[in-house]
């Protein structure tokens, strides 16, 4: 069970809504993933239409919506988008994204911290997408963010946990949930993140661009479940030396 702010989730897999070939395929994949928290970009939703092709099927599916501020380049733009989302969707939950460079889509740490502090004061449940910077993540926690979402690699790159060393520090020091976001390309990446101690992962591109998104969503669901179980089982410690699993001493003595 995962708790963030006032909500609890059975699934440790969060999903996105971008890049799917159709809204029907998007919903089928989300259902197959078992995800209960789904993020959507406000810039892609027509808030004037109750039957919006993205929003309507998500509401019907009964998932918790996590609007994001993707496309915002400054704290001011992100705050404005957040206020629109709260008014339109009736939720104070927000994935805070500020990336001024459209090529790399890396989060702006200064603007993110500035916006996070302001939004928390306005009553938002803020989940900030940020670099894998332990100092920044701690500052975001201190200003009241309900979770932190450090990247594993650049958005949509499918490179995996390129920031593993920093993620381990963030996980070790954090007192709020850590959700590894961006760069996760295959189910084994997700399992590794959960084994490391991350509380959840957010996956979009890896599922949406697969030849079979529904099958890939199922694979991610199983991988995340495996990662959680592996962590709970407490793996054995690493060793620089070999340790025989079947000692031969007694057997050889019996033959002597």
Swiss-Prot record:
Reaction equations catalysed: [ThiS sulfur-carrier protein]-C-terminal-Gly-aminoethanethioate + 2-iminoacetate + 1-deoxy-D-xylulose 5-phosphate = [ThiS sulfur-carrier protein]-C-terminal Gly-Gly + 2-[(2R,5Z)-2-carboxy-4-methylthiazol-5(2H)-ylidene]ethyl phosphate + 2 H2O + H(+)
GO MF: thiazole synthase activity
Pfam families in the record: ThiG
Main location: cytoplasm
Group of enzyme by EC: transferase
Keyword set, alphabetical order: Cytoplasm, Schiff base, Thiamine biosynthesis, Transferase
Record carries keyword Transferase: yes
Compartment(s): Cytoplasm
EC number: 2.8.1.10
List of residues binding 1-deoxy-D-xylulose 5-phosphate: 156, 182-183, 204-205
Cystine bridges: none
InterPro entries named in the record: Aldolase_TIM (IPR013785), Thiazole_synthase_ThiG (IPR033983), ThiG (IPR008867)
Catalytic residues as annotated in Swiss-Prot or TrEMBL: 95
Protein purpose: Catalyzes the rearrangement of 1-deoxy-D-xylulose 5-phosphate (DXP) to produce the thiazole phosphate moiety of thiamine. Sulfur is provided by the thiocarboxylate moiety of the carrier protein ThiS. In vitro, sulfur can be provided by H(2)S.
Assembly mode: Homotetramer. Forms heterodimers with either ThiH or ThiS.
Alphabetical list of HAMAP family matching this protein: ThiG (MF_00443)
Entry's family note: Belongs to the ThiG family.
Name of the protein described by the UniProt record: Thiazole synthase
Organism placement in taxonomy: Bacteria, Pseudomonadati, Pseudomonadota, Gammaproteobacteria, Enterobacterales
Gene that this sequence comes from: thiG
């Amino acid at each position: 069970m995962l708790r963030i702010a006032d909500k609890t989730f059975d699934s440790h897999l969060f999903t996105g809504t971008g890049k799917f070939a159709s809204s029907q395929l998007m919903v089928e994949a989300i259902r197959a993933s078992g995800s209960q928290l789904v993020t959507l970009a406000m810039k892609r939703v027509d808030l004037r239409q109750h039957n919006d092709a993205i929003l309507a099927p998500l509401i019907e599916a009964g998932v918790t919506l996590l609007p994001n501020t993707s496309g915002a380049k400054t704290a001011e733009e992100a705050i404005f988008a957040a206020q629109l989302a709260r008014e339109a969707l009736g939720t104070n939950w927000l994935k805070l994204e500020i990336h001024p460079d459209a090529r790399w889509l890396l989060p702006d740490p200064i603007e993110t911290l500035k916006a996070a502090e302001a939004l928390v004061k306005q009553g938002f449940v803020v989940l900030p997408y940020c670099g894998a910077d332990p100092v920044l993540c701690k500052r975001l926690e201190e200003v009241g963010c309900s979770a932190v979402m450090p990247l594993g690699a650049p958005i949509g790159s499918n490179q995996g946990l390129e920031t593993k060393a920093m993620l381990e520090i963030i996980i070790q020091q954090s007192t709020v949930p850590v959700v590894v976001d961006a760069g996760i390309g295959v189910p084994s990446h997700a399992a590794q993140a959960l084994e490391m101690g991350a509380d959840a992962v957010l996956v979009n591109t890896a599922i949406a661009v697969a030849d079979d998104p529904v099958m890939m969503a199922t694979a991610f669901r199983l991988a995340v479940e495996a990662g959680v179980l592996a962590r709970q089982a407490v793996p054995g410690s690493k060793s620089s030396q070999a340790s025989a699993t079947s000692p031969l001493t007694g057997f050889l003595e019996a033959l002597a």
